[in-house]
Amino acid sequence: MNVIIDYKVGNLHNLKNALDFSSVENQLVSTADDVRKADRILLPGVGAFSPAMEQLKNSGMLDALQEKVQTGTPLLGICVGAQLLMDESEEDGTHAGLGWIPGKVMRFQHQLKIPQMGWNQVSQQKADPLFQEVADEMHFYFVHSYYLLPQNSEHVLGLSSYGYDFASVVRKDNLWGVQFHP
């Protein structure tokens, strides 16, 4: 079962509606027991990093998510959900993330208009099952003021450009993160 983590942060219903429309079996979950039954996990998120991390910690699902990640269950973080996978974020001070993908979440340079809002291309850097049936340079919708900066360039699957190139798709083992809204 594909589960969408409901930790009261994110546009869960748009994601669920998109999966339903595509006939992809899915379920919104908000308990550790339901997380433990997952075959694949979607971790959405919108808003600020620190409150999202606090909500995830307070949800009671963090230990179950950690167990699933350690046993190889595929997990896709979306927008702030992708940012939470990193070690830390500099949004409103320095805040610890999940630390599942080494790296930081950085603010776009001040001379850029933020948030970046609109359609942007993703340039695929290497082949990956995530890109199956997705054309290189395809446009996706972005709304963000911070970007992923993985410590290891091997974790970068896709780049986008907004003033400069930034990682818009990352992967480490069974973890994927996308900065855009699919």
Give the positions of each predicted feature:
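N-terminal beta1-alpha1 ligand-phosphate binding loop
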Residues: 2-24, 180
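An anion/phosphate-binding loop that grips the pyrophosphate of nucleotide cofactors and donors
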Residues: 38
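Structural alpha-helical scaffold elements that stabilize or flank donor/cofactor-binding regions
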Residues: 34-35, 68
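Amide-donor transfer/coupling interface in amidating biosynthetic enzymes
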Residues: 70, 104-182
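Structural motif
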Residues: 42-44
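Cysteine-nucleophile active-site neighborhood
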Residues: 47-118
